[in-house]
Regions:
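N-terminal membrane topogenic signal
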Residues: 9, 25-30
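Short juxtamembrane and helix-loop transition motifs at transmembrane-helix boundaries
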Residues: 13-23, 48, 72-80, 139-143
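Helix-loop junctions at the membrane-solvent interface of multi-pass transporters
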Residues: 25, 45-49, 167
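Membrane-interface alpha-helices at helix entry/exit sites of multi-pass transporters
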Residues: 83-85
């Protein structure tokens, strides 16, 4: 699937919010902080089984997360701190939401695997940056082949979780228990795809 590689298509959905925030002169780091707060509130809403609130809080957390970088580019306020802060906020929200949803809807084992695999799927990129040395940037983002490798990343995780939240709210046969298991399994396969790509392209002794 890899929605990340189709960023220009996704931009149509979040750019209006980003442009509004740009016109309001909202600082990019404040937008990132807002995304973090909304994501944390979403995790708490899942904990208290307020599924509709959790759905919208998680949705807007994702939209603000997409908007912060766009606002930074539009306003010329891109900083390395902002990029790091955005990354930390992403992992905080993902870990908290997947952990709580996994624990209470699928059990502690699935929660552990879902959080661990999600973090590994992301952490493999900065490790690759450090070891392989990707440096080129486009619009503030590091250009690397892994951006297009792995069919199930953060956008797919969010979309799946939001979809199964609605299923759970509607009391359909497939709910959040099944959703978190699907996310975990697909993330594992996507991580394996990234590892195999790195092995194929950088596994030779001459490349070390």
């Amino acid at each position: 699937m890899n929605l990340t590689s189709k960023r220009e298509v996704l931009q149509k959905f979040y750019f209006p919010l980003a442009y509004l925030l740009f016109l309001l002169q909202a600082p990019p780091n404040v937008i990132t902080l807002t995304s973090l707060i909304l994501g944390t509130a979403s995790a708490l809403a899942y904990y208290y089984d307020h599924l509709l609130s959790a759905f919208f809080l998680f949705l807007f957390s994702g939209l603000f997360d997409l908007a912060d970088g766009e606002v930074a580019r539009l306003s010329g306020r891109q900083t390395k701190f902002g990029a790091v802060f955005d990354w930390i906020a992403d992992k905080w929200v993902d870990g908290l939401v997947l952990g709580i949803v996994g624990y209470f809807y699928a059990g502690p084992v699935w929660a552990t695997f879902s959080v661990t695999l999600s973090l590994l799927h992301s952490f493999i990129k900065p490790v690759a940056y450090a070891e392989i040395g990707y440096q080129n940037r486009l619009k503030g983002k590091i250009l690397d082949p892994l951006e297009g490798i792995g069919f199930f990343g953060r956008p797919e995780t969010h979309f799946t979780l939001l979809l199964f939240t609605l299923f759970e709210k509607a009391h359909l046969p497939l709910g959040l228990s099944e959703g978190i298991k699907i996310i975990t399994l697909l993330t594992a396969l996507s991580l394996l795809q990234r590892i195999l790509y790195l092995y194929k392209n950088y596994g030779k002794v001459d490349d070390e």
